[in-house]
Amino acid sequence: MKQALLLSSSSYKDTGYLRHCKNWIYEFLKECGVWDEQVLFIPYAGVRRTNDEYEQKVIDCLEYKNIASIHKFSDPKRAVAEAKAICIGGGNTFALLYYLYKFDLVEAIKQRVEAGVPYFGWSAGANVAGSTMMTTNDMPIIMPKSFDALNIFPHQINPHFISGKIAGHNGESREERLEEFLIVNQKSLIYALPEGTALRIKGENATVMGMENSPVLKMAYQEETELIKVGESFKF
């Protein structure tokens, strides 16, 4: 059965890096029966830090030592093939997907997750778990081979969702940007995840998790946005 934890963000308000979701990750690993197994960490989204720095930051902040970054393996595909759990950190989604394709890991990760290997990721790591990365919030700093992503969750994900316009900003709101996507891709569904929320995937079912009662938004072309409250589940 497919097992995934897709986190909107690495931080929530002033709680610190991965602090708000640390227990969620612990519970996820225990529930999936891999608490004592090594987690394969994929740091490719972390453009502004080295792979070593990113790995150490995650180990320190999660207070979980059994993490090994994929950049330390001589054969990345084999590392994925042998992984007992897979984690992808946040950063720049364009860079992340570029390297996943460069090392031929997209299909490899898909196959492992379909086979029941637990997957968790935050921000860019949640975005690429969707059908494509086309609802990312990130700068296109490098061009991946394709926008097609891991399709663990077969719809679009927009992490870090914030409603409305920031004071002094005269560009489009997040809702307007996502509406643009739906105008061009009318059969797609978008699930917008506010800060501090997550989707817990079990098979073909998802449950909304959250620090507060911040609902996940389900958006479809020319339809009223549906609010899915924390604790509610849905089939996809």
Feature roles, as predicted:
Residues 93-103, 167:
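Glycine/threonine-rich flexible loop motifs
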Residues 87-90, 113-132:
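Catalytic nucleophile loop
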Residues 81-82, 115, 152:
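Alpha-helix C-terminal capping/helix-to-coil transition sites in glycosyltransferase folds
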Residues 41-42, 48-93:
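A glycine-rich, hydrophobic loop/mini-helix early in the fold
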Residues 2-34, 46, 51-53, 135, ...:
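C-terminal and late-domain segments of enzyme folds
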Residues 102-116:
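Catalytic-core regions built around general acid/base machinery
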